[in-house]
Amino acid sequence: MNTEATHDQNEALTTGARLRNAREQLGLSQQAVAERLCLKVSTVRDIEEDKAPADLASTFLRGYIRSYARLVHIPEEELLPGLEKQAPLRAAKVAPVQSFSLGKRRKKRDGWLMTFTWLVLFVVIGLSGAWWWQDHKAQQEEITTMADQSSAELNNNQSQSVPLDTSTTTDQAMATTPTSPVDTTATNTQTPAVTAPAPAVDPQQNAVVPPSQANVDTAATPAPAATTTPDGAAPLPTDQAGVTTPAVDPNALVMNFTADCWLEVTDATGKKLFSGMQRKDGNLNLTGQAPYKLKIGAPAAVQIQYQGKPVDLSRFIRTNQVARLTLNAEQSPAQ
């Protein structure tokens, strides 16, 4: 009777409870069992409480229970029927399904995150491209307007320079025409000077050829005026030299062009020293009251010297934009 009662009581106990009772009968602690089986104390505790660790497969759990049973001297055949009915096996079977659903949910969330990231990236690239295009278009429009203004000013300058050219040609014609009678009169005046020592010839010449003497006298009278015209024309180079002398000014602005370039130069008084298009291999010398304000359409096409020193335009060349700078007396360009 006692044997049957003990057998029924053992069947009523779970696997974990039977292992715990056997351990206590042998006087072993959970720490001692864990050290002998090379397990964690938490794993031994879960086995005794009939819990299936989430990170432990059912195959390993069965192996740990068998090792635990051999340690506490419980036959494995008595535990195998109970292992089939215990919750740890069912939990082990359900765990992979849960992990699969979690992985699927995580993958879906990562997909949404990646889509949002690509969307933000495309928006940033689109905004950057739109901003660059607007800036480039604005620069092109500004260069076009400046070129139109320069062409209009060139046309006005050409229309105004036509009468100036005609007046200069007429002045040159008037200046050159008196020179021929001056030379002839000079020769005529020299011939009487040679024949002057012959007193006997003078009455005959006066009596025979009075018209020639009249011509000589009339030609001799405008000779001072003719001789004064070259003297008056002689100061013209000095006037031209006076015009070019400002190039020696220490505040002179010297520009050499390696390509076609539009520019506008204004001095401190607001006077436009130059506004128009300069061609390749051209140079320009300007003088005025500092500081100078410059607006250059193609900074890479011009080399500027101010006060004998080159002006740095590299920052405008790198950005490929219209250069707006001010040259003061200390030669410190500022945009």
UniProtKB/Swiss-Prot annotation:
Residues 148-244 are annotated as: Disordered. It is found in: Cell inner membrane. Its main location: membrane. Residues 30-49 bind DNA. One of its GO terms (molecular function) is DNA binding. The keyword Membrane applies. The chain crosses the membrane at residues 112-132. GO terms for cellular component: plasma membrane. It is a single-pass type II membrane protein. Gene3D superfamilies: lambda repressor-like DNA-binding domains. HAMAP family: RodZ. Belongs to the RodZ family. Cytoskeletal protein that is involved in cell-shape control through regulation of the length of the long axis. The helix-turn-helix (HTH) motif in the cytoplasmic domain of the N-terminus is involved in the formation of spirals to maintain the rigid rod shape. As this protein is anchored in the cytoplasmic membrane, the HTH motif may contribute to protein-protein interactions to form the RodZ helix, which is localized beneath the cytoplasmic membrane. The C-terminal domain may be critical for determination of the rod shape by probably interacting with enzymes required for synthesis of the peptidoglycan layer, including PBPs in the periplasm. This is Cytoskeleton protein RodZ. It comes from Escherichia coli O6:H1 (strain CFT073 / ATCC 700928 / UPEC).
